[in-house]
From Swiss-Prot:
Stated role: Catalyzes the transfer of a dimethylallyl group onto the adenine at position 37 in tRNAs that read codons beginning with uridine, leading to the formation of N6-(dimethylallyl)adenosine (i(6)A).
Similarity comment: Belongs to the IPP transferase family.
Organism: Microcystis aeruginosa (strain NIES-843 / IAM M-2473)
Protein name: tRNA dimethylallyltransferase
Superkingdom assignment: Bacteria
GO BP field: tRNA modification
Cofactors required: Mg(2+)
Positions bearing the site annotation: Interaction with substrate tRNA: 103
Subunit structure: Monomer.
Amino acid sequence: MTTSSLPILIVICGATATGKSSLALQLAEKFNSVILSADSRQIYREFNIGTAKPSLEECQRIPHYLIDICDPQDNFTLAQYQEQAEDLINNLHYSPLFLVGGTGLYIKSIVKGLKIPRVSPQADLRRQLQALGQSYLYQILTQVDEEAAKKIHPHDQVRTLRALEVFYLTGKPISSQQGENPPTYPILQIGLDCSPESLGKRITVRTDQMIARGLVAEVQNLGDKYGWDLPLLQTLGYAEIKQYLLGEISLEQAIDLIILHTRQFAKRQRTWFRADADIIWFPVDKENLLESVEREIILFLEGLSRPDIKTHHPD
């Protein structure tokens, strides 16, 4: 396969509320392309407002892929995401393609070519493990796979369960089954960043907008339809409104908690992405941000056509 026939991938990443989706939409229009989502909650149908899912109008402007691909009660693994994303990257006839989102592991699975254990979720095993409680599960993980435990937060039940699930079904630690096999096609990673103060203001505005758009009604409908124990209703934005709807806290308290938890989440995202030296960063408050990023992409594409310039390839 020649370089000219390879797909070209432009990644737009960064913390939540930095304007990734808006910028990507404008860039996709300028380059006559499409957008692949890298968001672990936008894959679920009916979870719209709280996940800041692209609107119908935005999807009509530019085709979006990897959103609304499974039902709220479905288990969707990183391996499934990687498989579907790679299939799209290799078969969509657009150049470049835009991969956009804030789920670092989704992006890393593509950019670094993570080797992921192909172990299907086992509902019965997960129920048995969950009954033991997250604290005890994490203790078990530290004993059977210390390397994985170092990379998983003690309160991250989803990844803890997955690591233990792989261990019990294969007899091998998940950390020993992981590795990297970077793709051969060219990749440019663009990161959006801003100061904590500016990001805090953006998060407050974004939260207020979600409430105004009907987040409370969305959560109520989801709880009524799927039950309040639905795992997705324990995630950011939904968990806090759920507490309000169940009479545990006031709406004002719920909004304050969403803002607080989103800021904490954004800080973790920023730390994750900052660890990748291949990302080229742009401040979101920069004048002419769109033009600056567009120019960076054009220079990258021009470089690919020149044999004297080395094609970008993840380490």
